[in-house]
Amino acid sequence: MSYSEKTTVDPLLRDLDEKKESFRRNVVSLATELKQVRGRLVSQEQSFLKETITRKEAEKRGKNMEMEICKLQKRLEERNCQLEASASAADKFIKELEEFRLKLDTTKQTAEASADSAQSTKIQCSMLKQQLDDKTRSLREQEDRMTQLGHQLDDLQRGLSLRECSEKQLREEVRRIEREVTEAIAKAGIGGMDSELQKLLEDVSPMKFERMNRLVEVKDEEITKLKDEIRLMSGQWKHKTKELESQLEKQRRTDQDLKKKVLKLEFCLQEARSQTRKLQRKGERRDMEIKEIRDLISEKQNLNNESWDKQKFWDNSGFKIVVSMSMLMLVVVSKR
């Protein structure tokens, strides 16, 4: 080969060598870049996988949270229904308690009225007993007077019978004496003396008989007056005794009626007291039930407030940060 050809070939070879070296360098740089790109791609794929996994986990968490939110909403609705039912029941219990209180007030008023009436009836009974005692005393006094008058009447009747007997005896004695005198005169046989004695006897005997008859008539008049007075007194006394007996029977009847009324009022008072005790016990039980219902309502309200606070977990800053980061990751992945 000539020198001119060598001189022309050398620069070409040099250029070729330089090009080869530059190509090699480029290939090496490309290989390194390819390795870097592959490493980046692997890292990006790993990060993408991680992001997909985190996204799936976030989606699962979101679904779980949605399910929990639905469950909490259902529980909240159920508790609201229970709360409304308990509130309505509490209102009913309160209304019933008010009705029981009104009944208790009415029963107390009736019991007080019955107690007042019983007290007034007791006072009336005591007054009637006093009146009855006074009337019994007066009746006893009248009975004593009646017995005294009866004794007096018996004495008068005895005296009257004795006077009648003595009058009969006197008349018999006078007749006997007249007979004896007449018999003695007849036996003596004296004529003039007989006529004179007969005249004297005729004069004396009518005078005595007239006097005796007058005395007897006076005594008879006195006896008739006494009999009339005794009859009047006995009639008045019988009338008074009948009136007193009728009054006594009336007083006894009124006393029995008042005793029956008192017993009825006492029975009504006992029933009213028992009803008041029962109503007080029912009222206390209702108060306890209302307190328990109010406590349950307050507990349910507190639980509902706590669940509502738990239900508002999306308002928390941590949840907002997690959601914003997941959204940014999803945007970056979608852009890539």
From Swiss-Prot:
Q: Provide the Gene Ontology terms for cellular component.
A: nuclear inner membrane; nucleoplasm
Which controlled-vocabulary keywords does the entry list? Answer: Coiled coil, Membrane, Nucleus, Transmembrane, Transmembrane helix
**Source organism, top-level taxon:** Eukaryota
The answer to whether UniProt assigns keyword Transmembrane helix to this entry is: yes
State the membrane topology: Single-pass membrane protein
Q: Where in the cell is it found?
A: Nucleus inner membrane; Nucleus, Nucleoplasm
- Residue window of motif Bipartite nuclear localization signal: 240-261
Q: Which residues form a coiled coil?
A: 125-261
Quaternary context: Forms heteromers with NEAP2 and NEAP3. Interacts with SUN1; SUN2 and bZIP18.
Ribonucleoprotein recorded as keyword? no
**Stored InterPro entries:** NEAP1-4
| Effect of loss of the gene | Double mutants NEAP1-NEAP3 display reduced primary root growth, and altered nuclear morphology and chromatin structure.
Question: What name goes with this protein?
Answer: Nuclear envelope-associated protein 1
TM region positions: 313-330
